[in-house]
Amino acid sequence: AVASEGFKNKTDKSGKPYILHCIRVMQNLHTQDEELMSIAILHDCVEDKVCTIQELVAWGFSQRVIIAVGLLTHDQAVPYQEYIKNLSWNYDAVKVKLSDLRDNSNITRLKGLTKSDFDRMEKYHIAYTYLSKI
């Protein structure tokens, strides 16, 4: 409910409802682990200002979920590769980030490809390669 309500008016780069990205990230984990599924659904919520870590605590999410969502929240003041390294110690964050990177790298989701899209794909590829070796 947190993610679906928070992202109800947000669309992705192709104009589709943003919540579908979160659902695909969850589905692509191929798991029945409800906490891992929650992490996947919530992975962009704090970063995109849908909610705060404190609210997740108040709503009763487990420490496992809160820690992983916190690690998956990219503070823009932190360089991207440092952010990736910082989350790499947490199994749940790595699993969800790999699924997120796979979904974000799917160029069929984009309306058209620009130079910035190719640059972003290169950044994602470097992160995916690093995390997949963990």
Enumerate the predicted regions with their spans.
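Active-site helical microenvironments for divalent-metal-assisted chemistry
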Residues: 1-134
